[in-house]
C-alpha cells in the first residue's frame, strides 16, 4: 500500500512534475492588462483538447472494458482528492438525470467525504487507508470499475484506491496529467493526458482539471452509449424529473419518431413517461407493456428491441 512521503521527498517529487513547473515567462503576468491575461489563459486552455486527443486509443480501450463490466451489473466508481475528486462527483451526479442510472450505478468518491466538496479536509488526500475504507463501504466487487483521478498521478488516496480495487479483481483506470505516474502504473488502464505547466504554477484546477473533465465526459457518455442509453444522439433514457426535462422528453420522442404531439402524449402516458418505451410504442406499433418486455429482453437497447418487434 502506498505510504505518505516525508516533506523533503514530496518536494523533490513535485519538482519532477510538469504540472508543477514554474514558467519564468509568466512571472510578471500580474502586471498585464486584464484582456491580455484572458488571452493568455484562453490560449493555454486551447491546448488541452489536443493533449486529450493523443490519448484517445487508451481512453477508448478503457471505455470498452468499463462497458463490459457495467453490462454485467458492475458500477463505475471515481476516486480522487481535491479538484480531481470534485470532478468525479460532478460526473457521477449527472448520470442519473441524463441516463436514468440508479443512484449507486455511477459513484464519485472524494477524499474526506462530502464535506470535501466545499472545503479542504486536512490530510485526507494523503491516506490510501481512507480510500480502502471508502471502497469497503461500497462492498466493491470484481464487476466494478474504479477510476483513480489525480493530476500529479501520485496522490495517495487515488493510487491507494486503484491498488486496492485491483487486488480485489475490479477493473482499474488511472487518469493522470504527468508521464510515468504511479497512478497509471498501478491501474490496468493508464491514461496520462500531459497538459504541461499551468498558467499559475501548480494550479492543476486549470488545464489539468479541464483535461480530466473532458476525459470523464468521454468515460461516462460513451460507456452509456455502449450500454444502449441513447438512440443515435438522443438521450432516450433521460429521467424527466422537472418541467424542462419533461419538455425535452417530448422533443426527443418527436425527433425519434416524427409523430404528432397527441400521439406522443398518448405513448408517454401508456409507458409512464418512459421515453425509450414511448418511442418503441410509436415506431413498432406495440402497447406499453409489450414495449417494456421487448426492451428488457434486449438489455435496454432500443434498436435491438425494435428489430425484435418488427422481425
Swiss-Prot record:
It catalyses: N-acetyl-D-muramate 6-phosphate + H2O = N-acetyl-D-glucosamine 6-phosphate + (R)-lactate. Its EC number is 4.2.1.126. The active site is at 94 (proton donor), 125. Residues 66-229 form the SIS domain. InterPro entries: Etherase_MurQ (IPR005488), Glucokinase_regulatory_CS (IPR005486), MURQ/GCKR (IPR040190), SIS_dom (IPR001347), SIS_dom_sf (IPR046348). A lyase-type mechanism (elimination/hydration) is suggested for the cleavage of the lactyl ether bond of MurNAc 6-phosphate, with the formation of an alpha,beta-unsaturated aldehyde intermediate with (E)-stereochemistry, followed by the syn addition of water to give product. Belongs to the GCKR-like family. MurNAc-6-P etherase subfamily. Specifically catalyzes the cleavage of the D-lactyl ether substituent of MurNAc 6-phosphate, producing GlcNAc 6-phosphate and D-lactate. PANTHER family: GLUCOKINASE REGULATORY PROTEIN. This is N-acetylmuramic acid 6-phosphate etherase. The gene is murQ.
Amino acid at each position: 500500500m502506498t505510504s505518505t512521503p516525508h516533506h523533503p521527498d514530496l518536494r523533490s517529487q513535485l519538482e519532477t512534475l510538469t504540472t508543477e513547473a514554474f514558467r519564468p515567462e509568466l512571472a510578471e503576468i500580474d502586471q498585464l492588462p486584464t484582456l491580455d491575461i484572458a488571452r493568455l489563459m484562453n490560449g493555454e486552455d486551447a491546448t488541452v483538447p489536443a493533449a486529450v486527443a493523443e490519448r484517445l486509443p487508451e481512453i477508448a480501450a478503457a471505455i470498452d472494458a468499463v462497458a463490459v463490466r457495467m453490462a454485467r451489473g458492475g458500477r463505475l466508481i471515481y476516486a480522487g482528492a481535491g479538484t480531481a475528486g470534485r470532478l468525479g462527483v460532478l460526473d457521477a451526479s449527472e448520470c442519473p438525470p441524463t441516463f436514468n442510472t440508479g443512484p449507486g450505478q455511477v459513484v464519485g468518491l472524494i477524499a474526506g467525504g462530502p464535506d470535501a466538496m466545499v472545503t479542504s479536509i486536512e490530510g485526507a488526500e494523503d491516506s490510501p487507508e481512507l480510500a480502502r475504507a471508502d471502497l469497503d463501504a461500497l462492498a466493491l466487487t470484481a464487476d466494478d470499475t474504479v477510476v483513480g483521478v489525480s493530476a500529479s498521478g501520485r496522490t495517495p488516496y487515488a493510487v491507494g484506491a486503484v491498488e486496492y480495487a485491483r487486488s480485489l479483481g475490479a477493473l482499474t483506470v488511472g487518469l493522470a496529467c504527468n508521464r510515468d505516474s504511479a497512478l497509471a502504473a498501478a491501474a490496468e488502464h493508464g491514461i496520462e493526458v500531459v497538459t504541461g505547466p499551468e498558467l499559475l504554477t501548480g494550479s492543476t484546477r486549470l488545464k489539468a482539471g479541464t483535461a480530466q473533465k473532458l476525459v470523464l465526459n468521454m468515460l461516462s457518455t460513451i460507456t452509456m452509449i455502449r450500454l444502449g442509453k441513447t438512440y443515435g444522439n438522443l438521450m432516450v433514457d433521460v429521467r424527466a424529473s422537472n418541467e424542462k426535462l419533461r419538455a425535452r422528453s417530448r422533443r426527443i420522442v418527436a425527433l425519434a419518431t416524427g409523430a404528432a404531439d397527441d400521439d406522443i402524449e398518448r405513448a408517454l402516458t401508456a409507458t409512464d413517461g418512459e421515453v425509450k418505451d414511448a418511442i418503441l410504442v410509436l415506431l413498432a406499433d406495440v402497447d406499453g407493456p409489450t414495449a417494456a418486455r421487448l426492451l428488457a429482453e434486449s438489455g435496454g437497447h432500443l434498436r435491438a428491441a425494435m428489430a425484435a418487434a418488427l422481425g
